[in-house]
């Protein structure tokens, strides 16, 4: 389930987070990405391109790799420890730094809503929810690591514009309504930083995700012997991509600075492309 946020369309999705109703007016995209209607339309508008790796542009990344966080009132001690283990997994392997929120305006909030899902990328407004299941049925650690991947700016790996060179999708084996989980970006939002497709990414779906029958294969790797869908931890590619994305230096700090719209227009991206209304986009909620 991997795909970095490309940085071009998140603004509208930021407005939707009501203080007491965290997912009001948000639509679920690809099972675990939450987006506003406008963000969903923009995301869906960029699915047929050629950029590699599903990673967002700088505008949708957390400045300096610093991510404040809080816990909702319903999160128990076990849930807090689960979230902390997932954050430590990222921090021990990248230059990202999660810290308890003080007065920061933008932050993530861990909560129980019964699902494993999160907003994609940095929106810059209000709190961004990361749901880690429920007290009775918490998400596995690997799934929480995966959801934090969405939160820091990854789409699903199979959302990459070049994914058809690496996996075959069998729509006949999909359950009804699962098609939207297998959309790909057209290169408008995605910036791969020159990295190759990563079968081993923690952001990649398994072969059976979204299937309509037991053991029915929905997504088959083209490379013989390749395994997809692991939830053990970050792959070497995940780590490398994150450190490139957040401009990690030799001291283990992020040199990523805030990017405004004007700077973003000058900083990479394909100006000839337009968002694909049917493609994934920043600010959506993904699982």
UniProtKB/Swiss-Prot annotation:
Q: What is its EC number?
A: 3.4.24.-
Source organism, top-level taxon: Eukaryota
Instruction: List the expressing tissues.
Output: Nematocyte and pharyngeal gland.
Name the enzyme's class. hydrolase
Query: Where do the record's region annotations for Disordered lie?
Result: 249-287
One MF term from GO for this chain? zinc ion binding
> One Pfam family from the UniProt entry?
Astacin
Cysteine pairs forming cystine bridges in this chain are 95-248, 116-139
Compositionally skewed regions (Basic and acidic residues) per UniProt: 268-287
- Annotated Peptidase M12A domain ranges read 53-249
Question: Which cofactors are required for activity?
Answer: Zn(2+)
> Which key words are in the record?
Disulfide bond, Hydrolase, Metal-binding, Metalloprotease, Nematocyst, Protease, Secreted, Signal, Toxin, Zinc
Q: Name one GO cellular component term.
A: extracellular region
Q: Which residues bind Zn(2+)?
A: 146, 150, 156
Cite the active-site annotation: 147
How is the cofactor bound, as the UniProt entry phrases it? Binds 1 zinc ion per subunit.
Which Gene Ontology terms describe the biological processes this protein takes part in?
Answer: proteolysis
Q: Where is the signal peptide?
A: 1-20
Q: State the InterPro entries in the record.
A: Astacin-like_dom (IPR034035), MetalloPept_cat_dom_sf (IPR024079), Peptidase_M12A (IPR001506), Peptidase_Metallo (IPR006026)
Q: What does this protein do?
A: Metalloprotease.
Q: What's this protein's name?
A: Nematocyst expressed protein 6
